[in-house]
A protein has these predicted regions:
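Active-site neighborhoods and metal-handling regions in enzymes and metal-associated proteins
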Residues: 1-192
Length: 192
């Protein structure tokens, strides 16, 4: 529902209704190290056509982000690239205008209306661990890739977050066994 558009919602006092989405952001600690995961699920077991459209756009951003995240970029550069990918998806969703994006103030990108947080953060001893934002990403870094699309006017808030380990052989998604596609989530929700 509408509270999925609040990045870190704390009250949790509303009764969910059919048609609502539940955005879950949770993690665990093991041996003093943190993990962080977000998934969005439909209360009724099936996404509406619009929810599915927005969810799949967010998933495409995440998949592109996992591929893009590498040692040639700093976190600042990575976020800028994710911003461009997000703009394209928001244009396709009818939320942004291509001409307005072309003429936007680069210091106030229009996509931030619908994706107001960073594309991810360092993980380690703390769930939001410290790391150099302006230096190149290093092998061994552990990072979240967590795009979100939040549309308060439509009561749609979607975030998909996985933990990525950067290795010389490529990025390893530590959450690869956790369902993430619309089909996987609907199968679980409907008991298939």
């Amino acid at each position: 529902g509408k509270n999925a558009c609040i990045l870190h919602y704390g009250e949790n006092n509303n009764i969910v209704q059919a048609g609502d989405l539940i955005l879950m952001d949770f993690g665990v600690e093991y041996a003093n190290y943190a993990a962080d995961l977000s998934r969005t699920i439909p209360v009724s077991g099936k996404f509406s056509p619009r929810q599915k459209e927005v969810y799949n756009a967010c998933l495409r951003i995440q998949k592109a982000g996992i591929e893009l995240f590498n040692t040639s970029l700093s976190l600042i550069e990575y976020n800028a690239e994710i911003g461009k990918i997000t703009e394209s998806e928001l244009i396709q969703l009818g939320l942004l205008d291509k001409i307005a994006v072309k003429n936007q103030n680069p210091n106030a990108p229009l996509y931030k209306k619908y994706f107001m947080h960073g594309a991810g953060h360092f993980l380690g001893i703390d769930v939001h661990d410290v790391g150099p934002r302006y230096e190149k990403i290093q092998y061994g870094n552990l990072f979240t890739i967590e795009p979100g699309i939040y549309i308060p006017a439509e009561n749609i808030g979607i975030r998909i977050e996985d933990n990525i380990h950067v290795t010389p052989e490529g990025n390893v998604n530590l959450m690869h066994d956790i369902p993430v596609t619309v089909e996987e989530i609907e199968d679980i929700m409907l008991g298939s």
